[in-house]
Design a protein with these regions (language model features):
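Compact, charge-rich alpha-helical regulatory domains located at protein termini
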Residues: 1-9
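Conserved P-loop/Walker A NTP-binding site and adjacent catalytic elements of P-loop NTPases
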Residues: 9, 17-108
Length: 108
């Protein structure tokens, strides 16, 4: 990861390691801009970008970081998607992102 990524430094160690395993050398602009805002948790956030623009990780990386940094019992996140195929794709991605953690991911 390049040395200019302050958003990367905000992420939980497990999430940073996942990013390294992906071979990423930098975050996309949408991720750089979204991560600090999502982590602040003081406002609603809409993330908009072109297809394959990095939206999913712009949301999931800070959400997973928060959950890993602040473990709780019970229900943490409900992520709603309009398409079954998209749910299945995101489920597979989340399983990969959460591998090696105690986090449970359930598609429904």
């Amino acid at each position: 990861m390049n040395n200019q990524s302050s958003s990367f430094e905000l992420l939980h160690d497990s999430v940073q390691k996942w990013i390294w395993r992906q071979g990423w050398t930098s975050l996309k602009d949408i991720q750089e801009n979204s991560i600090p805002v999502v982590l602040r948790r003081d406002t609603d956030v809409i993330i908009s970008a072109a297809t394959a623009g990095g939206k999913t990780e712009a949301a999931f990386l800070p959400i997973l970081s928060h959950i890993l940094s602040n473990p709780s019992e019970g229900f943490d996140v409900l992520y709603v998607s309009p398409l079954k195929a998209l749910i299945n794709d995101q489920y597979r991605r989340l399983l990969d992102m959460t591998a090696g953690t105690d986090m449970e991911v359930t598609p429904w």
